[in-house]
Structure formats: C-alpha cells, structure tokens
C-alpha cells in the first residue's frame, strides 16, 4: 500500500516561473506515482486561481490543500478603515529616516513560528489523511517542522542556507553589533530547528558539508534539482553581442548580483565593445528597474516571458551571483537549452562545471569581462554548449532524481 506524503510549501510551484518553482515541482512530479500525494500551500493576494486547474492537469494525482491567507473586510466601514491604516503606515514610512538595521530584522522574521491558524491546519491535515511523511520546503516556512505530530516523519528540503547568505551580507557591515547579534541568533535558531527534522535534503554537496560543519546532526542527503532537457541539442550560435540575466528581483541574490555586474563589469565591457546589449528576464519592481536604468539606460527589462528559450537563444547568460547558497537553476536551464554562460564561483557552487571546459568561472570583474569577450569565438561557444549539455543529461535526469528521493524516504 502506498504511503501518504504531504508537501508543505510557501506557494503552489506553478507556473514554473523561477528556479525554486522548478525544483519543487520536479521533486513532486518524480514521485507522484510512488506515493499518495498531498500538497499544502499558501495562497496570498495576487494569486491566480486558474493556476490550480493548470497544476492539476500536470499532476492530477495530487490532493491540493490551499492555505488561503487572503482576507476580505466584513463591511464597507471596515474596508475604509483598513485602507486608511495602510495609507497612514505608508506615509509614516516616508517620514521616517531610513534604518539600515531593518534588513537584519527580516533575518529574524524568516524563521519565526507560522501563524497559529495554519499550524493547526497542518496538524489537522496530518491526522485526517493519516500522513506518513511531511516534507517542508523553503527557509521562511521551516518552522512547520516544529508543528507536526510525532507520528509523522519530518523531511526538510534546504533550497538555500540562510546563515550563508546572511554571513556574506554581514561582510559589508562588519562593525554593526546589531547585525552580528541577529546573525548569531538566526544561525542558532536555524541549526536547532534543522535538528528537529528526521532527514534533511540539500541541493548540493557543498550545502551538506556546510550544515554538518555548523552542528547539524540530523542525517543529510545531497539530492539535486532537474530541468527538462531536449533529446537532441541544436546549438543556436550567432554573432549577436547579447547578454542575458535570468531571475526576478524578489530573490535578493539576483538583485545584488545584477547590481554587482553593472557596477564592476558592464561599463568596462561597453568601453571595449559598445555593441553589447543586456536583457533582464523575470519580474522586477518598477522602482528597482528605474534605479538601475538611471545609470544604465541601455539595459532592457523584459519581465516574465512565456518561452524562455526563444528569448535567450543566441545570447551569453551571465550568473554574477555573489551571495547565497543552494543551486542555481538558471545554470542548469542554460546548459539544457544550449546557452553558453559565465558565472561567479558562488553562482555555480554545487554544480559540477569546470572553468574553461563547460563555462567560464571567476569572481574577478576584469577577468569576467575578458571571458565574455572570449565567447565571441564561435568554436569556444560550441565547446561550452556541448560540454555543459552533456553534464546536465548525465547527472540531472528525472529517473535519477526519483531513485534518489525514494532512497531517502525508505530510510525514514
């Protein structure tokens, strides 16, 4: 008889608009025929309810359990008061001097206990459906690990190590006592919480090692994420001098990485080759776009695109990520689609690519510019495309992922 597997998620991973969405979706999809699948997920304002039907077409076996946080005021008076409160809060924020410590408060917020209503919801789901295994994903809802019945085996998928990202951010503010305190607090909380799980899955062996070094004693398995790969690779190589950056600004490493590239590399590249263009794919807030366009008016923001390949084919993808952990799905996507790429060391961390063989890897802005210019060589582009694509096909297949996850669940 099949066991009952509950996925507890911060969002429904569909459509596949980000690397996180893809990693979660493929993790569910690969075991959908091996378990009775239940998916509890948060629903927030802006959620398109039609997405639920689209998801069901892809994984009809799943029982979907939305945690709808949208609230409607009971009457007109309450709605007016609610709107006034939000307007006053926004105006008060404008009048308040910027506090550089606000971002450190967000570190504390990220692993807070989930609202009582949804803790009880998850508990009731576990009892109603006799859940055998519950799998929590993404750091900002990791505290659900603490809300599960003792009869349920607890698995946590660590997409990104919070303490790694915070530690890198702290390097830019080394004398801030409050920041140091927040870092130590969140680190202790993160490690303690992870030790309450029965098993932890990381998406790279590097993250597994870092967790063990910080004192995690729960068994850890390095799994991986996958992307869809075409059976036959048809490289699309042109003389176009186009760079692409893929990723939304709600992921802080994307914001920091793009700004780092624009500040340290972009103008130097344009001085050497004025014809280069830079296109940014993914949803970005208008204020963030305008902030970048002020000093870099030639950057093109394309927003979310329905067909990523058609948008980035013929380009060189840049992955200038400087903070964070986990695995960069954008690199796996590029390799699977036949898109050559250049990356920082952090950007490619945990992915078995080698500098000069599959891509170019460097943290030196000057060398990064030189590497981009080297990729004007069509033969070198083709070499990188073929080598990286072969790596993805060999190490990131759906069946390999399925066997990996089943081995983990069998150990519980």
Protein language model features and the residues they cover:
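Active-site proximal beta-strand in glycosyltransferases
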Residues: 5-6, 148-170
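Conserved nucleotide-sugar donor-binding subdomain of glycosyltransferases
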Residues: 81-133, 139-142, 174-196
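Donor nucleotide-sugar binding/catalytic pocket of nucleotide-sugar-dependent glycosyltransferases
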Residues: 155, 180-183, 191-232
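Acidic donor-binding loop of glycosyltransferase active sites
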Residues: 198, 312-326, 337-339
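Conserved acidic donor-binding segment of nucleotide-sugar-dependent glycosyltransferases
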Residues: 356-366, 373-379
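A charged, aromatic-enriched C-terminal amphipathic alpha-helix characteristic of glycosyltransferases
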Residues: 379-410
